[in-house]
């Protein structure tokens, strides 16, 4: 639970551009993981799919919160 709180605090400190970069990097890693799972016959740690997706969702949520704070 502590790691999640640290990630959230870290994401809240980032600028919009840094959040975009974080999202892009996580999407790229998720794509690579999916390709690795589909194209290779080696075992893939399937829990990483949900970790990447949740990290992306958290970053998008924080980005939306910042946008709402500015406009609302």
UniProtKB/Swiss-Prot annotation:
CDD domains registered for this protein in UniProt: Ribosomal_L29_HIP
GO biological process, one term: translation
Domain of life: Bacteria
One annotated GO molecular function: structural constituent of ribosome
Cystine pairs: none
Nucleotide-binding found in the keyword field: no
Recorded GO CC terms: cytosolic large ribosomal subunit
Keywords from the UniProt entry: Ribonucleoprotein, Ribosomal protein
Classification via InterPro entries: Ribosomal_protein_uL29, Ribosomal_uL29, Ribosomal_uL29_CS, Ribosomal_uL29_sf
The family this protein is said to belong to: Belongs to the universal ribosomal protein uL29 family.
Protein name: Large ribosomal subunit protein uL29
Gene name as annotated: rpmC
């Amino acid at each position: 639970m502590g790691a999640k709180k640290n990630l959230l605090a870290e994401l809240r400190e980032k600028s919009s551009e840094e959040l975009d970069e974080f999202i892009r990097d996580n999407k790229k890693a998720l794509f690579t993981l999916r390709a690795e799972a589909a194209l290779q016959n080696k075992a893939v740690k399937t829990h990483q799919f949900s970790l990447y997706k949740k990290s992306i969702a958290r970053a998008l949520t924080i980005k939306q919160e910042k946008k709402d704070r500015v406009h609302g």
